Design a protein with these regions (language model features):
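Residue-level detector of Asp-centered blade-edge/turn motifs that repeat once per structural unit
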Residues: 53-69, 128-132
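Short loop/turn segments immediately following beta-strands, especially the blade-tip
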Residues: 10-18, 88-89, 149-151
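Short loop/turn segments immediately following the C-termini of beta-strands
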Residues: 2-5, 13, 56, 77-78, ...
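Blade-level signature of beta-propeller repeat domains, shared across WD40, Kelch, NHL, RCC1
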Residues: 125-151
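Gly/Pro-rich loop segments of beta-rich domains
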Residues: 17-50, 62, 89-124
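Conserved beta-propeller blade signature
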Residues: 1, 60, 71-74, 134-137
Length: 151
C-alpha cells in the first residue's frame, strides 16, 4: 500500500533468500488520487493504507498461477471507505461512501448496511478475526473502532 500515492503494490517474497522482489502496482495509479472501482490500473484510490488478507472459500484450490485463495481488504483514508481487492486485481467497494449527505459529504458516522448506509471518517486501521468473520476498523476522525462482517 502507498499512503502518499493512490496505488496498491505487491512484492513477492523468496523464502529461501529471505528477500522481497521489486514491488509492482497491482491496482490504482500513483499519479491519480481519486475514487473508482475497476481492475488493475483503472481503479482509483486516495491514501490506501492498512490492509488484511482474508481467505475466500469460493476460490477453492486457488486461482491464477499462484493459486491465490485470498482477497485483500484495505482502508482508503481520503475516500472514507474500505476496499476489497481480489486475486484478479478487481477493486470493489466493500464499505463506506454511501449516498452523499444533504451537504454533499460522503463521510460521517453512520452504521448500517456496509454498501448502502455505512459511513466512515478517515478509516485508517483494519484487523480481521477469521473465527467470527468480523472486521475491526479504526475510524480516526470518528474516534472509534467500528466493525463489520464480510457477508
Amino acid at each position: 500500500l502507498s499512503d502518499n500515492f493512490g496505488a496498491v503494490f505487491r512484492a513477492d517474497y523468496d523464502p529461501v533468500a529471505k528477500t522481497f522482489g521489486n514491488p509492482s502496482i497491482i491496482a490504482g495509479n500513483m499519479n491519480d488520487k481519486s475514487f473508482k472501482e475497476g481492475t488493475g490500473g483503472s481503479a482509483r484510490f486516495n491514501k490506501p493504507q492498512f490492509g488484511v488478507f482474508v481467505k475466500n472459500e469460493k476460490y477453492g484450490e486457488g486461482i491464477g498461477p499462484d493459486k491465490d485463495q485470498y482477497d485483500f481488504y484495505f482502508c482508503d483514508r481520503e475516500n472514507h471507505c474500505i476496499w476489497k481487492l481480489d486475486p484478479h486485481g478487481v477493486a470493489s467497494l466493500a464499505a463506506g461512501r454511501s449516498n452523499e449527505n444533504a451537504d454533499g459529504k460522503i463521510w460521517g458516522y453512520v452504521d448500517g448496511n456496509p454498501l448502502h448506509e455505512a459511513r466512515f471518517n478517515q478509516p485508517a486501521g483494519l484487523a480481521y478475526d477469521p473465527d467470527t468473520d468480523m472486521f475491526y476498523i479504526g475510524d480516526i476522525d470518528n474516534k472509534g473502532i467500528r466493525y463489520m462482517t464480510t457477508e
